[in-house]
UniProtKB/Swiss-Prot annotation:
Entries under PROSITE patterns matching the protein: RIBOSOMAL_L19
GO molecular-function term, one example from the UniProt record: structural constituent of ribosome
Gene responsible for this protein: RPL19
Name of the protein in question: Large ribosomal subunit protein bL19m
Organism, scientific name: Reclinomonas americana
GO BP annotations listed: translation
SUPFAM superfamilies, sorted: Translation proteins SH3-like domain
């Protein structure tokens, strides 16, 4: 049973398309996605990565940004086919916590990208 779990983990890490990018909590990211509603169009999203959840088959990140004075959080699965490109723009200053959930209580001027 243990060997099966180890082989599944190795296969999942080899399949990861974005394993070259070393994304950490607190990074400012720019993600390009493809939307397939009526037409195929690309959308560029920017935000602060406030959390990363690593599972056996996939990795999920949470982005937070203020758009038009309203806070917005989005979750993305890194292995999803709708994600075209992930670019690390910068890093926020401050605490070295693993999860940046304290940014939810901060003012919009401190969280704006």
């Amino acid at each position: 049973m243990l060997n099966l779990i180890q082989t599944l983990r190795m296969e999942a890490t080899q399949k990861s398309r974005h394993k070259k990018t070393q994304i950490q909590s607190g990074d400012i990211l720019s993600i390009t996605t493809t939307q397939y509603k009526n037409k195929k169009r690309k959308q560029n999203l920017k935000g602060i990565c406030i959390g990363i959840k690593k599972r056996i088959g996939y990795t999920t990140i949470q982005l937070r940004n203020f758009i038009g004075g309203v806070s917005q959080e989005q979750s993305f699965i890194l292995e999803s086919p709708i994600i075209n490109n992930i670019e690390i723009i910068g890093k926020i200053k401050g605490n070295t916590k693993a999860k940046k959930y304290y940014l939810r209580t901060k003012s919009p001027s401190e969280n704006k990208v």
